[in-house]
A protein has these predicted regions:
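Charged/polar low-complexity intrinsically disordered segments
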Residues: 2-3, 20
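Intrinsic disorder/low-complexity segments enriched in polar/small residues
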Residues: 3-4, 99
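Sec-dependent N-terminal signal peptides
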Residues: 4-16
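Acidic, contiguous N-terminal accessory segments
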Residues: 11-12, 19-105, 152-163
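Hydrophobic alpha-helical segments
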Residues: 16-17, 22, 66, 133, ...
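Feature activates predominantly on carbohydrate-active enzymes
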Residues: 39, 47-50, 54, 93-313
Length: 313
């Protein structure tokens, strides 16, 4: 009988715990504060501002920001595990072991609401998850006109203790433009894609059209055979021997002679050197020069796909 009674009481307790809600805003009144702990960076500030901005758009109420926890308000912590003054509940500490890459931990209990990430980029993702899941916010297209923000007087979160990790580390699509729209990277970030930038906590992504970086045009004067044969003449990648800069880097007018083993050897050595100089780079993109002028020497022609050669390409 006692065992049955205990089981029943325990079940009721668990149901009540699962049904617990922690209001950030109630009837249009702010009941929570964002606590900015010591040791934070621009990313923590930005993530907190995003939460504050969109909760205000939803409810009309402004979450306060503080340097220390409030005794009256529900405290919100957006931080990395090493933030000074952060006191994680035991359950949150245990779950933190499961966080990887730019994933995040969401924990909500009587102690407060915690958005914790090992990589700062994950802090933004954690905030956006809260706004999407409990605020119904959606960012459909870049810019204010492309966002959907429901209006209501309340904003609450249930009891939370979960880890959200990405399925794969790098998530993005490249917008091919020399002058990308400023709002587009933010829109991508809000939709879970990886972005560079100090506010986004992005990693270092290097490379691009770098053949002319890996094979400097300065070598043209002594080794023209490394460079592309175009209309019967070997040319540097800048297109004109008279325009070779002091460093000889950055030309994009044509491609080098990629059938020459020495060309490949030099490019390989310079690539390894670049990688060693940037050990923290998350990705390194290696693209040909931004030009359709390929080497027309006999050996390079042999590398052309037959269908393109037949079309004179």
């Amino acid at each position: 009988m006692q065992k049955t009674l205990f089981s029943a009481l325990f079940s009721v307790f668990m149901l009540l715990l699962g049904a617990a809600e922690y209001p950030l805003v109630k009837d249009g009144k702010s009941l929570a504060a964002i606590v900015r702990l010591r040791g934070g960076t621009a990313v923590e500030i930005f993530a907190g501002s995003e939460l504050q901005t969109y909760v205000e758009k939803i409810t009309g109420a402004t979450l306060s920001k503080r340097r220390s926890p409030s005794a009256e308000l529900y405290n919100i912590y957006i931080a990395t595990p090493d933030a000074r003054g952060l006191k994680l509940p035991d359950k949150a500490k245990e779950l933190l072991k499961e966080v990887r890459d730019d994933g995040f931990l969401l924990y909500a209990g009587g102690e407060g609401l915690y958005v914790i990430a090992r990589e700062r980029r994950g802090l933004n993702y954690g905030v956006y998850e809260l706004l999407k899941r409990y605020g119904g916010v959606r960012w459909i297209t870049p810019g204010p006109e492309g966002e959907f923000v429901p209006r209501k007087k309340d904003f609450s979160v249930p009891a939370l203790a979960e880890v959200v990790n990405p399925s794969f580390r790098h998530r993005n699509f490249n917008l091919v433009s020399a002058h990308g729209a400023k709002l587009t990277p933010l829109w991508q970030m809000r939709n879970g894609m990886t972005q560079n930038g100090p506010l986004y906590g992005g990693g270092k992504h290097l490379g691009g059209h770098i053949f002319s970086t890996l094979l400097p045009d300065a070598l043209y004067r002594t080794n023209p055979e490394l460079f592309g044969l175009y209309k019967g003449k070997r040319l540097p990648q800048c297109g004109d021997p008279a325009k070779i800069t002091k460093t000889g880097i950055g030309g994009q007018a044509n491609q080098p002679c990629t059938s020459n083993p020495e060309t490949i050897r030099i490019m390989q050595e310079n690539l390894v050197r670049l990688l060693r100089k940037n050990p923290g780079a998350e990705s390194f993109c290696i693209l040909n020069n931004d030009s359709t002028a390929w080497c027309e020497c006999e050996n390079c022609r042999k590398l052309d796909p037959p269908e393109e050669a037949a079309r004179g390409m």
